[in-house]
């Protein structure tokens, strides 16, 4: 089930965030960086994100357990919304959940009259092919600090 995240979800969102980074970015990001990821720091991050009026975070859960999430930004001063995060645990990928989360964000984006939605993906991240299947297209290249 997909639903809007609440403050009670910050810990499971942070746990999925850290685990998903470790699963997805192995061999893309240095292992020492992945080893330093902290659920506590991510919990603080997601608590802050959920307090922001222009952000929406949706979680995917099964049996009352959060297994994935997507975060969207709807800036008040720009015509483009953003997919800021989409993370699913490895064992649920390929079931259409990511697509459903993206479609939910695109629908909200249209409702709010945004012209486009953007997201950033590391070049070596194979999920860029997932985004292309959802209709995304390459705009520009930058480094991880962009």
Residue ranges and their predicted role:
Residues 4-8, 15-91, 102-104, 108, ...:
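Acetyl-CoA-dependent GNAT
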Residues 89-95, 123-124:
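Active-site acidic-Proline motif in GNAT/NAT acetyltransferases
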């Amino acid at each position: 089930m997909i639903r809007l995240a609440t403050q009670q979800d910050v810990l499971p969102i942070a746990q999925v965030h850290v685990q998903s980074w470790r699963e997805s970015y192995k061999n893309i990001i240095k292992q020492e960086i992945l080893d330093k990821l902290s659920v506590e720091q991510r919990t603080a991050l997601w608590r802050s994100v959920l307090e922001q009026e222009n952000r929406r975070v949706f979680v995917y859960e099964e049996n009352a357990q959060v297994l994935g999430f997507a975060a969207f930004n709807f800036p008040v001063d720009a015509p483009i919304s953003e997919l800021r995060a989409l993370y699913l645990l490895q064992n649920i990928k390929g079931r259409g959940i990511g697509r459903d989360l993206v479609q939910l964000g695109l629908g909200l984006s249209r409702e709010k009259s945004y012209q486009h939605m953007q997201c950033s993906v590391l070049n070596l991240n194979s999920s860029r092919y997932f985004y292309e299947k959802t209709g995304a297209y390459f705009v520009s290249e930058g480094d991880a600090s962009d």
